[in-house]
Amino acid sequence: MIDPIEQFHLNKIFTIGHIGNQEIAFTTSSAYMLLAVVLIAAMMLGAGRALVPGRFQSVVELAYEFVANTIRTSAGSHGMTFFPLVFSLFMFIFVSNIVGIIPYTFTVSSHIIVTFSLALLVFLTVIIYGFYKNGLKFFKLFVPSGIPAVILPLVVIIEIISFFSRPISHSVRLFANMLAGHVTLKVFASFVTMLGALGFVGKVGALLPLGLTVALTGLELMVAFLQAYVFTILTCIYLNDAIHPGH
């Protein structure tokens, strides 16, 4: 059977430079992240501002309204301050996920270093803006209202641990779902290849895993959107803590 993990291996395209003894390389992951950015930029530039929107403009406007409504629902009107960040994260993750479904491509979001970097960006934004806007009142985030004084110290400790574990849970959720989905697809696709090599009987038997592969591909398209949405809505919820730490 073809190794289902092989698709996640990083291949060096060229060396950018060195920091000490550490090589800095432009890899397949770098290439597909750049591709996602180029595709998003092309979509934005090609959308136009026509009174009667075309296809690209309709897609961009739909994405804009979707993200804007998500922010308003989760973080209120003040959350629109972060629209450029949230919209960029949603589009980058969604486009990267869609590109990764195409055979023989690379799934950027299946690497924990990528998803953790995005989650860490959100985490640091929450901390920096939280202190910038609220000062020391930001610490109210760790002291929920209405908690009895007897158990308050325990609750504060739990809240602090929960807060600092956010980048881990935020990143692992996206990484694990994309990794598991692509491994499953690869396994069923390899069954098709193996059975197809066994002659007529094998080709007939390959119809079942082929059908499952097609069905799973459709499911992965839905997962590609759902995971981008989940990452986005969690980002909005976390940003709401920076805007309204006492709520």
Curated annotation (Swiss-Prot):
Keywords: ATP synthesis, Cell inner membrane, Cell membrane, CF(0), Hydrogen ion transport, Ion transport, Membrane, Transmembrane, Transmembrane helix, Transport. It is found in: Cell inner membrane. It is a multi-pass membrane protein. The chain crosses the membrane at residues 24-44, 82-102, 112-132, 141-161, 181-201, 206-226. InterPro entries: ATP_synth_F0_asu, ATP_synth_F0_asu_AS, ATP_synth_F0_asu_bact/mt, F0_ATP_A_sf. The keyword Transport applies. Key component of the proton channel; it plays a direct role in the translocation of protons across the membrane. NCBIfam families: ATP_synt_6_or_A, PRK05815.2-4. F-type ATPases have 2 components, CF(1) - the catalytic core - and CF(0) - the membrane proton channel. CF(1) has five subunits: alpha(3), beta(3), gamma(1), delta(1), epsilon(1). CF(0) has four main subunits: a, b, b' and c. This is ATP synthase subunit a. It comes from Bradyrhizobium sp. (strain ORS 278). The lineage of its organism: Bacteria, Pseudomonadati, Pseudomonadota, Alphaproteobacteria, Hyphomicrobiales. The gene is atpB.
